UniProtKB/Swiss-Prot annotation:
Residues 119-234 form the DOMON domain. Residues 30-61 are annotated as: Disordered. GO terms for cellular component: endoplasmic reticulum membrane; plasma membrane; postsynapse. It comes from Rattus norvegicus (Rat). GO terms for molecular function: dynein intermediate chain binding; protein-containing complex binding. Residues 1-28 form the signal peptide. This is DOMON domain-containing protein FRRS1L. The chain crosses the membrane at residues 271-291.
Length: 293
């Protein structure tokens, strides 16, 4: 029994030392972690220092921050797999001249047999529901337009123009001819607009409603009008005078419900189409073949 008492008395000092060491460690840990008032943090700054708190960036663990940081990453993983990107914008669909006279009406001005990519000027129209879709194209780096007129003269006309600006865009604008001057009108009936500038040509496509509320600058397309065709240069996105002094126009009023494919030779191809010129050529040919008496 005496031996057991001696062994217990030997363990008591050791247990007391371990207990005191544990208490000391618990008292020191708040100061070391910077949790207590006036303590020092892991970066050696005073926890009570507001300026130091602002200097150290903090991480926001909210979902919005997580999503933003996730999508800011360039790759999904270290293997380098890129994030899927938005699909490219559909390219401008080419104008189908084979539909001219069948499912849409067309006007071609230029070389005989030309199409939407080679004519000096091209226009098509077709009904789509309560709208009329127009396609315009011209050999210019500025603008191409169509005017709806009660006569063949410029003045008091509703005009839709596709304008190529300095940023490379093609915008659809609405004008009203005041005499020989085209005034831009803020109310624009065009929608579903698209345009492109390629191969030194301005080409566009847009829709506008057949019937519109009464407005002197916007005509009702269910009525028949003369169509005025024009194109020319632009300066900083603003149209200037058309390329030719006497722009072509439709020979008669146009109905959007009647699809025709009409060709108009440009000035360079009109010389030999004149009846007088043809008669002169026949006379000269006969003279050369028969010889002088």
């Amino acid at each position: 029994m005496a031996g057991q008492s001696l062994r217990r008395s030997a363990w008591v000092p050791l247990l007391l030392r371990l207990l005191l060491a544990g208490i000391a460690a618990c008292e020191a840990s708040p100061a070391d972690d910077g949790a207590g008032p006036g303590g020092r943090g892991p970066r050696g700054r005073a926890r009570g220092d507001a300026g130091a708190d602002e200097a150290v960036p903090r991480h926001d663990s909210s979902y919005g921050t997580f999503a933003g940081e996730f999508y800011d990453l360039r790759y999904l993983s270290e293997e380098g797999y890129p994030f899927p990107t938005a699909p490219p914008v559909d390219p401008f669909a080419k104008i189908k001249v084979e539909d001219c006279g069948r499912t849409k009406g067309c006007f071609r001005y230029g070389k005989p047999g030309c199409n939407a990519e080679t004519c000096d000027y091209f226009l098509s129209y077709r009904m789509i529901g309560a709208d009329v879709e127009f396609e315009l194209s011209a050999d210019t780096d500025g603008w191409v337009a169509v005017g709806f007129s009660s006569d063949k003269k410029m003045g008091g006309d509703d005009v839709m123009a596709c304008v190529h600006d300095d940023n490379g865009r093609v915008r659809i604008q609405h004008f009203y001819n005041v005499g020989q001057w085209a005034k831009e009108v803020q109310r624009n009936p065009a929608r579903d607009e698209e345009g492109v500038f390629e191969n030194n040509r301005v080409t566009c496509r847009f829709k506008r409603p057949v019937n519109v509320p009464r407005d002197e600058t916007i005509v009702d397309l269910h009525l028949s009008w003369y169509y005025l065709f024009a194109w020319g240069p632009a300066i900083q996105g603003s149209i200037t005078r058309h390329d030719i002094d006497s722009p072509p126009a439709s020979e008669r009023v146009v109905s959007i419900y009647k699809y025709e494919d009409i060709f108009m030779p440009s000035a360079a191809y009109q010389t030999f189409s004149s009846p007088f010129c043809l008669l002169l050529i026949v006379a000269l040919t006969f003279y050369l073949l028969m010889g002088t008496p």
